[in-house]
Amino acid sequence: MSLFKKVACFTDIHFGLKSGSRTHNQDCEDFVTWFCETAKRENCETAIFLGDWHHNRSTTDVSTMNYTVSNLERLSQSFEKVYFILGNHDLFYKDKREINSIEFMRLFPNVIPIKETLTEGDVTIMPWLVADEWKNIPNIKSRYMFGHLELPSFYMNAMVQMPDHGQLQAPHFANQEYVFTGHFHKRQHNRNIHYIGNAFPHNYADAGDDDRGMMILEWGGKPEFKTWPDQPIYRTYKLSQIIDKPDALLKDKMHCRVTIDLPISFEEANFIKETFVPQYNLRELMLIPEKVEVDAQSTPIDINFESVDTIVMNQINAIDSDAFDKALLLDIYNNL
């Protein structure tokens, strides 16, 4: 008997993100509600969460704990079985799995924590791999594999690819028809490996990339991806753009960074912000001055202007040291 007939999956929801923000935690709860309702309509009897339920590996505030328990209960009541992968953010230590932040799962008998690799029938489900566990992957023959994997050449976000550290590689999954994984938030695939995309956009590293949500897989079929229609979104615009076409560009629950490319006063800029935020129910509208500094005495030259985000990410990616975890540094920066 197969582990599932029709499975619904999501990943990397990160309860407790943004210092335990109530707004973010409520977004997470609203997403889980939508996920369960959608899975029920699609007749999914099984759910798999692919890792990173919590954001902070060392501390979880009381409000976040309450959201965690209520949403684990919601998942438990919505499915016959829920397989729950421990991601790196769910572990107190990144290099071992002995302590995790989701021990609440023991309250729900049909929520099954994946603390060690589980193979049942033609399905393998793996937690965040530690030490040399990756070396066992080529020996696994399962048709379907679910995990929380860190694979080189895939994008950690829209700009930065995961560097190759000479360990787990895409060719190690030659025996699988499909590999589904969390960890990198951008939805992407290469051959048989699918990063399904996290639950919804979390920060400006996700700006303009709304392909997030859930995945549904019927045994023997092809994966189907669905985007949460009420998700918060992130955008970067120029002021001239939003003044010209506000109705087309500004949306409900939007976080918006706007570069001031017009000659306006502080009072005018503040008026625009105070008008647009309530009118379009924006979560955030940040007005950023456009700074261009050119030496008047110099001859004309081509200047390549880079955003602060680009500069910081390039500098982190250029670090050549085994003492630093580039992926972790990028994750910390993106969530500032």
Stretch-by-stretch model annotation:
Residues 1-18, 326, 332-335:
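Acidic, histidine-bearing metal-coordination/catalytic regions of metal-dependent phosphoesterases
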Residues 4-6, 17-117, 172-176:
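Core catalytic region of metal-dependent phosphoesterases/phosphodiesterases
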Residues 8, 122-124, 215, 233:
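Conserved beta-strand elements of the Class I
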Residues 9-11, 46-52, 81-88, 112-115, ...:
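Active-site neighborhood of phospho(di)ester-bond hydrolases with catalytic His/Asp-centered motifs
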Residues 14-18, 55-58, 85-96, 131-133, ...:
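Active-site environment of divalent metal-dependent phosphoester hydrolases
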Residues 41, 218-336:
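Accessory, non-catalytic peripheral segments of nucleic-acid enzymes
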Residues 68, 86-171, 196-199:
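Conserved catalytic scaffold of divalent metal-dependent phosphoesterases
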Residues 158-223:
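Conserved beta-sheet core of the metallophosphoesterase superfamily
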